[in-house]
C-alpha cells in the first residue's frame, strides 16, 4: 500500500475503499466477467469474444508510470496520483466486425476517469477530507460506469469508432436478439 488505509481513498490496491465504495478496478472486473471463453481476436488494446450470437468487444487504453520504481515516492501524492504518467494522448480506434446481417442491440459500458471512478469523482468534488454519510452516498450514486444503448442494422459488417482517454476500459456487448442480453 502507498498510503494509510484509514482514510477515504487511502491508496490500497483493493476493489473497494474502506467505506465499501466501488473503485474503478471493481467495475473493470465486472466488464472482464462479461467476456466469453471463445476468443475471436485480440490485439494490443482490445479483445473480441463470442458466445452464440453475442459478441463482447473490450477496448482498453492503459498507461504505466514513468520511472515508477525510481520516482514513485516523489511523484505520487494523495490527491495527484496521475502526475507520474506524463501527458498521454487519447487513443482512436476503428474496429470492423464481420457479423451476419441482421438487427443488433449494442450496450457500451465505460470505466474511465470520468465514468465509474469514485476516486476521480471525489477529486472533482474538491477531495473533501470529511467522509460524511452524505458525501459517501453522493459518491456511491454518481460513480457507476456510464452505459449507452444503441441499435444497428448490419449488412456484412459493423464499424465501431471509439476514442479512448487514457486509463479507460470500454466494453461493447453486441447481441442479435436484444431480449437475451445479460443484465449487470
Predicted regions span which residues?
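C-terminal beta-sandwich/jelly-roll accessory domains of carbohydrate-active enzymes
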Residues: 60-184
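Aromatic/acidic polysaccharide-binding cleft in carbohydrate-active enzymes
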Residues: 1-77
Amino acid at each position: 500500500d502507498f498510503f494509510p488505509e484509514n482514510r477515504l481513498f487511502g491508496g490500497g490496491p483493493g476493489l473497494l475503499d474502506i467505506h465499501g465504495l466501488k473503485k474503478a478496478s471493481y467495475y473493470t472486473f465486472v466488464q472482464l466477467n462479461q467476456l466469453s471463453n471463445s476468443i475471436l481476436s485480440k490485439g494490443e488494446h482490445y479483445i473480441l469474444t463470442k458466445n452464440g450470437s453475442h459478441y463482447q468487444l473490450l477496448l482498453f487504453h492503459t498507461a504505466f508510470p514513468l520511472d515508477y520504481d525510481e520516482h514513485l515516492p516523489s511523484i505520487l501524492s494523495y490527491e495527484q496520483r496521475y502526475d507520474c504518467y506524463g501527458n498521454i494522448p487519447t487513443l482512436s480506434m476503428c474496429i470492423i466486425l464481420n457479423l451476419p446481417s441482421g438487427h443488433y442491440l449494442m450496450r457500451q459500458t465505460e470505466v474511465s476517469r470520468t465514468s465509474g471512478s469514485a476516486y476521480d469523482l471525489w477529486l472533482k468534488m474538491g477531495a473533501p477530507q470529511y467522509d460524511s454519510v452524505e458525501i459517501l452516498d453522493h459518491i456511491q450514486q454518481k460513480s457507476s460506469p456510464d452505459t449507452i444503448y444503441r441499435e444497428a442494422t448490419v449488412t456484412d459488417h459493423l464499424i465501431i469508432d471509439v476514442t479512448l482517454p487514457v486509463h479507460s476500459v470500454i466494453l461493447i456487448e453486441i447481441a442479435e436478439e436484444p431480449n437475451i442480453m445479460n443484465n449487470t
